[in-house]
Amino acid sequence: MKVATALTMLAVLLIVTKPRLASTEERTRPMSRASLDGVELEYEVRGVGEPVVLVHAGIFADWFKPLVEEQALTGRYRVVTYHRVGYAGSSRPAGPVSIADQAAHLRGLMRHLGIERAHLVGHSSGGNIALQLALEAPELAHTVVLMEPALSVPTMGQERMLSLRAAMAPVFEAYRAGDKARAVDGFMRGVSGPDYRAVIDRALPGAFDQAVRDADTFFDQELPAVQQWTLRREDAARITQPILSVMGARSPQVSPIWMERHQMVLAWFPKAEGFVLPDATHVLHVQHPRAVAEALAAFFARHPVKAP
């Protein structure tokens, strides 16, 4: 069962201002669409100012919805959100989709929008995509924010690896059995803890059902792509843009891998800064969008695209 083994190993890798209320028009208007070299991406742009591009994680297409409602971010920046291929209404290509492919889609979207340089924000596997773009096209990435990226930790021991594989095995058993809802729930519990569902249901009504519809994308395409992608220390040293590593304070209680990744980012990248969000787990920007928006805005202000 090579596929099952690969998926299990990859799961281990993944292991205040007043908020702005969106207008009725903003909440209900359809997303725009961009045709990019054979794929179509849904996207939305809010605000004006220096461009900020948000690259969402797997599972939920609308991870960033609460964040873009925050005036601290969209009141000061031109914020772009989009659905990656295989999620919601974006294209659903057959066959593998690599992290490099995803970075190419991101690059194409920026070109489509006339963005020459941006602050990139990647959550979980979205962080890997942002890093890939920074490696391939450093001129496009002014800063990179990594919100608990899905990085492989070279120092993880064999015993821990086996233990984490065993913990995730029921998730992949459920997926192979066709119980996509149980697979999605089990995976999210593994990376975010048991309280994630209440947070998601409150902030993103309907998101769990959409995640079940998108489950094939996540389990069949995204997880293998993340497993096959590697970041070496010498690669990280080439990324000289300012980096902000964001971690939820309660994430290490869910799995020690989150602290290991956070520390790895701070050690490997030449210009890395750290931010730990109190009372938060892997769903940190859904739990506390205002605090995350303020932290991002402060980081971007310290590193403006056009220095005064």
Describe the residue ranges of each PLM region:
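Conserved loop-alpha-helix segment in the C-terminal half of the alpha/beta-hydrolase fold
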Residues: 69-72, 234-280
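Conserved hydrolase catalytic core segment
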Residues: 116-158
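Helix-rich cap/lid subdomain of alpha/beta-hydrolase
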Residues: 153-207, 220-227
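Active-site loop/oxyanion-hole signature of alpha/beta-hydrolase fold enzymes
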Residues: 75, 80-121, 125, 294
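Conserved HGGG/HGGXW glycine-rich cap/lid loop of the alpha/beta-hydrolase fold
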Residues: 35-92, 109, 300
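Catalytic active-site module of serine/aspartate enzymes centered on a nucleophile-bearing elbow/loop
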Residues: 269-308
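Conserved catalytic-core motifs of eukaryotic protein kinase domains, centered on the activation segment
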Residues: 64-66, 90-95, 155-157, 257
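Bacterial N-terminal signal peptides
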Residues: 8-15
